Design a protein with these regions (language model features):
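Structural detector for internal amphipathic alpha-helices that build alpha-solenoid repeat scaffolds
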Residues: 25-33, 52-67, 77, 85-100, ...
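Short amphipathic alpha-helical/adjacent loop interface patches that line ligand
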Residues: 5, 61, 72, 94, ...
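Bacterial N-terminal signal peptides that target proteins for export
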Residues: 1-10
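Short, solvent-exposed beta-strand/turn patches at coil↔beta or beta↔helix junctions
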Residues: 43-51
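Bacterial N-terminal signal peptides
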Residues: 9-19
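Amphipathic alpha-helical scaffolding segments comprising HEAT/armadillo-like alpha-solenoid repeats
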Residues: 35-44, 66-80, 100-112, 134-139
Length: 139
């Protein structure tokens, strides 16, 4: 009797354990992941209140390269962040995404002319060269 009860108990534990595991997997598991978090979470963090969080999100997206292409609209918005320490890694993320970031070309061209921080303006230029070399104005 005890052995039968143990068998039933072990089957229940196995069944419950696997369903708990399945429920704990993120529904967005097909998204690219960086540092254990899905792309959509990093995109959302570009709008976080803390600039350190926005900075970290931009660098994580940069590290994802072309896989972060769905983040381009949010990255374009983030180019207007009031904090230079956020704008800079956003330009890096667009550079790393490459040609899939073509939608950012007009804003990056504008940044080259209007950005008061020379490092960010230069990074915008490098991003443009990577996205589409013909989009970089001749000097």
């Amino acid at each position: 009797m005890l052995s039968r009860a143990l068998k039933v108990w072990s089957v229940m534990v196995f069944a419950l354990g696997s369903s708990v595991w399945a429920q704990s997997r993120p529904a967005h598991s097909k998204e690219p992941v960086s540092s254990g978090r899905p792309l959509s979470q990093w995109i959302a963090e570009l709008k976080a209140p803390a600039p350190q969080t926005r900075n970290a999100a931009a660098y994580e997206l940069a590290g994802m390269g072309a896989a972060a292409a769905p983040a381009v609209p949010a990255l374009i918005e983030a180019l207007d962040d009031p904090v230079p320490a956020v704008r800079y890694p956003v330009t890096i993320a667009l550079l790393e995404i490459g040609p899939a970031a073509k939608a950012a070309i007009p804003r990056l061209q504008q940044m080259m002319d209007e950005e008061i921080n020379d490092e960010i303006a230069a990074s915008a230029r490098r991003a443009l060269k990577r996205i589409d070399p013909t989009a970089v104005p001749r000097q």
